[in-house]
């Protein structure tokens, strides 16, 4: 496993995930009966400051259909958490107008690259174009100087 699991921290994430899903109207418990489901949800809500007990609640009451989705969410959150510790792995955000993002996404798709790789490639293309333009300008000046001397 690449990223260390931190039980207390991840239990808090699981609690937040389940509460968010409940507030969005999803069934987070395995119970069909509304009163049993509400009782289990109330128990979960009371565990906000008891991260160790959240895992027990999950084993006992959670809807089995949520298991894989929650695992994926926690795995992604763990990755972001550890990547945020280092400057070179931390995700950055930039504000783009929708049309710019749309064009960039289309270009990335056509090139078969990620958005980041496409941006780097565009920067390199612009730098190479600039170097080429400078070189051509220099050659033109040298040629004019040679022709002017004769």
UniProtKB/Swiss-Prot annotation:
GO cellular component terms, semicolon-separated: cytoplasm
Coiled-coil residue spans: none
Domain of life: Bacteria
S-adenosyl-L-methionine as UniProt keyword: no
MF-aspect GO terms: sequence-specific DNA binding
Pfam family membership, one: MatP_C
Primary gene name: matP
One GO BP: regulation of DNA-templated transcription
Lineage: Bacteria, Pseudomonadati, Pseudomonadota, Gammaproteobacteria, Enterobacterales
Role summary: Required for spatial organization of the terminus region of the chromosome (Ter macrodomain) during the cell cycle. Prevents early segregation of duplicated Ter macrodomains during cell division. Binds specifically to matS, which is a 13 bp signature motif repeated within the Ter macrodomain.
Name assigned to this protein: Macrodomain Ter protein
Self-association and partners: Homodimer.
Subcellular location: Cytoplasm
